[in-house]
Amino acid sequence: MNNTPREIPPEQSLIEYPCRFPIKVMGAHTEEFVTAMVFIAKAFEPDFDHATVEKRPSKGGNYVGLTLSIYVTHREQLDEIYRTLTSHPLVKYTL
C-alpha cells in the first residue's frame, strides 16, 4: 500500500489562493512557544501581526492552542508552513 500523499490538482482544491489561512498549532503554555510560532509566521508573512494570534489554553493550563492566520499565495507555500511548524521541537500538534 502506498502511503505517499497524492497531489491534488489546483482545479480540485477547495482553497482559493491567495488567502488568509488559519493554522492551529498546539504546544506548551509558555511565552517561548508563542514567540517561536510568531517568528515562524513572520518568516512566511513579514507583515504578520502578533496581535492577531488567537490563544486558547488547555483545561489544565499546561498547553495552549494558537490560531495563526497567515496570508498564503499558493499550495506549496502552505505545505512548507506546515512542514516548518510540525518539525519545530516545541510543537505538539498542528491542524
Task: Give the ranges of each region predicted by the language model.
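Long, contiguous binding/interaction regions
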Residues: 1-65, 71-95
